[in-house]
């Protein structure tokens, strides 16, 4: 399995094998399961993580908080690459929640437009390549 990070996570507490185990396709049957595994990843990195309401979440699925930062996270388990709407949503929703960082996770990559927008807005894009 390959994990490609288009952002930067400074501290790594979970080993690569632990991350690979979390992101096996059998563990990610639904978008909600994908969110739960991303949540576990951030908890492993030492963050306190809370979920937002399923509806009316302002484009943010998870909020990861440490002593120094608050991260807005959106998780997309799409069959196709994620577009710029997800980047706009997590950025604006994160501002609503008072976040200092913004991240979008995908299992099928990102469009060029999403990557370009994320670069301008400083939104981190994380593409999880699942082992088959």
Q: What does each model-identified segment do?
A:
Residues 1-132:
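Mixed-charge (Asp/Glu-Lys/Arg
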